[in-house]
Amino acid sequence: MFDALVNGRIDTGSLRFEVEYHDIEELNRGAGLGRADISKISCAVLPAIAEHYALLDSGAALGRGNGPLLVRRAGDTRPIRRVAVPGLHTTANALMGKLFPEIEERTPLLFSRIAAAVERG
């Protein structure tokens, strides 16, 4: 997201950055606690932190072909009763609640583990 900035591809003058990488749920939690000067967050938490942070013009992870996505095992036509979400304070979870309120069982998992969990059932 901040590749050019953190990897020295643009001149930042005397500014230096200390970069930390975390799961989106941890980033959301950290922003809520004011831990970072700049952070990626889920759009769903913006109202809760807007008093302390400003939204940047770039860096969004929403759009055609990227998150949030609803996936299931190929050939499975049963009604969806439970889903894995990348955190309870994420845009994916907020949209799930609005679009599919009947799916009440939402299990938070690291984003990188969701596909394998879906495959396993």
What are these model-predicted stretches?
Residues 1-61, 68:
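N-terminal hydrophobic or amphipathic helices and topogenic motifs
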